[in-house]
């Protein structure tokens, strides 16, 4: 009996002192294609490297992690055949139960949900990214909270110029979002944002978005409505 109690005590002590092991992972995404024309456009062909993401993410344990990512891609500021490097993410994240906080050069929440739901960025960007409704990353803070399995909310405040132009003008970009999952596979995303005018005489830019989609292992379908006011 004494030996059995001793074993139980040692096991319990080992479980109490167990700590989460730090973990890290490399990030590598490459978007490329092979294209060719037909007929009169037959000379327009070849391989194209559209964009690459290189980075590293490290989890220190107890919900604390850091991530750094560089974006290598095209820019309207240089020749089409040249590539330019930007820092896309340099951020710290902390997760505690249902709360998540992010700070630094973070991923924005304006259309991040739609990108993940779509899942085929290598084929086509999401609508808001393609038509410049906002930036996919910016310098600032964000917070999200999962109230229940079917509802979560998030808030963000960033500079508003994106990760390629860090605080060129004054003003902030504020955003609020709600994600609903009424049944498995079916999700609804609502988002509203306000980007403060950086110059006197100009109006604030307002963004509204509504998305709903259904996803199974065999197919994905979705619909999205976006509206932007006072865009220059």
Placement of each model-derived feature along the sequence:
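Flexible, active-site-proximal loop/turn residues at the rims of small-molecule/cofactor binding pockets
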Residues: 60, 161, 225, 229
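Detector for outer-membrane/organellar transmembrane beta-barrel domains
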Residues: 169, 179-232
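Outer membrane beta-barrel
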Residues: 16-37, 41-160, 170-172, 179-186
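A short, polar/proline- and glycine-enriched secondary-structure boundary/capping micro-motif
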Residues: 78, 113-114, 165-166, 199-201, ...
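Cleavable N-terminal export/targeting peptides
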Residues: 1-19
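Active-site-proximal beta-alpha loop/turn segments in soluble metabolic enzymes
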Residues: 156-165, 195
């Amino acid at each position: 009996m004494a030996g059995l109690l001793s074993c139980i005590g040692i096991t319990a002590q080992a479980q109490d002192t167990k700590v989460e092991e730090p973990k890290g992972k490399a990030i590598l995404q490459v978007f490329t294609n092979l294209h060719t024309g037909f007929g009169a456009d037959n000379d327009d062909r070849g391989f194209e490297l559209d964009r690459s993401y290189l980075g590293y993410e490290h989890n220190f344990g107890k919900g604390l992690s850091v991530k750094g990512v560089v974006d290598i891609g095209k820019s309207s500021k240089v020749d089409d055949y040249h590539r330019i490097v930007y820092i896309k993410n340099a951020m710290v994240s902390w997760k505690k139960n249902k709360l998540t906080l992010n700070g630094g050069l973070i991923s924005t929440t304006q259309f991040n949900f739609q990108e993940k739901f779509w899942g085929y960025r290598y084929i086509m960007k999401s609508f808001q990214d393609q038509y410049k409704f906002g930036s996919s990353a910016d310098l600032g803070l964000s917070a999200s909270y999962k109230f229940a399995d079917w509802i979560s909310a998030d808030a963000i405040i960033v500079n508003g110029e994106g990760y390629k132009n860090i605080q060129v003008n004054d003003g902030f970009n504020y955003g609020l979002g709600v994600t609903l999952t009424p049944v498995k596979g079916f999700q609804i995303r609502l988002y509203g944002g306000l980007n403060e005018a950086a110059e006197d005489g100009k109006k604030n830019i307002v963004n509204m978005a509504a998305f709903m989609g259904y996803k199974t292992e065999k197919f994905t379908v979705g619909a999205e409505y976006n509206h932007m006011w006072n865009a220059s």
